[in-house]
Amino acid sequence: MENDDISSKNNLNPQDQLNYKNKAKNLEFVKNNSNIKIPYFKEIISDDFENIEEILEEFSKQIIIRSNSSKEDTDETSSAGKFLSIGPIDKNDISLIKKSWNEVLQSYEKDDNNTVIFQDYVDGAKSVSVLTSYKVGTDSPYRTFSTYYGSQTDAVTSGRYNKIKNFFIHRSLDNLPEKFKEYYKFFKIQNQLENLFGNKQLDIEIVTDHKEEPLLLQVRPLMGKVIKKEPIMVERSAIDENVKRYKELITTTDDRFGTNQIYSNMSDMNPAEMIGKKPD
């Protein structure tokens, strides 16, 4: 499957790529270096408190206040879900916004930063999905797409809903079969982000709007069990070698009936299963 062109990918500084301590910076990086659509967002600092009404004029009718803790992710661990995100909130309800803002900050640790993310709430969402580059918590090299079909944008991450559809695809596949075309948009965005960040262990949250257009809510490093890439490649090599050997042996011979060779590790133990001119 083709990856869309990423305008400034060749000029990216590795130090500017995947940020473990600031989800807002990751979104900003994607916005500036790709064509992936993102609901309008802004990183809010404590100094913005006094002119919050002016800032909110830039947003749609409702917003989500998302955590942006510097302790949420490190290069070894993740605290995904530990810190609050609150919404949707009417952007004109200033008192509730300030109250919710403080509640999100209070969920942080004492020596944490004091920023949050204000993001447009996607009203009338068709679905929300979490895409992971690998099966979480395992060595399994499977892309995982977990989707909830409904407007609850926290359905997958909150753990409060059980009607979630999971789709797995092995990382060795570069294209999706036609029958799985509903997942094309997820596959495409995941590839774009992995290439953009130069990182193939990502945790991505996507929502589809009322037009079924995918919108990126957040992207973060995928934490969990370290992927043992060498054993995976050894396993793949063994499979490839066996396939090659089978193709060499599949050619029919004059002393056997039929047009296809079928191999078994039991037929030599049961004469009744040995079919041919000379069962010896």
Task: Describe every region a protein language model picked out.
Residues 1-35, 43-47, 75-77, 95-101, ...:
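Conserved divalent-metal-coordinating catalytic cores
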Residues 36-59:
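N-terminal auxiliary "cap/dimerization" subdomain that precedes the catalytic jelly-roll/cupin core
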Residues 38-42, 64-67, 116-120, 204:
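General beta-strand structural signal in soluble alpha/beta enzymes
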Residues 40-41, 65, 69-96, 127-130:
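Glycine-rich phosphate-binding loop of ATP-grasp-fold ATP-dependent ligases
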Residues 52-59, 77-82, 131-134:
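Short, surface-exposed amphipathic charged segments that create phosphate/polyanion-binding patches used
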Residues 55-56, 60-64, 88, 92-121, ...:
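Conserved ATP-binding module of the ATP-grasp superfamily
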Residues 69-70, 122-123, 149-150:
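Short, flexible beta-strand-to-coil junctions
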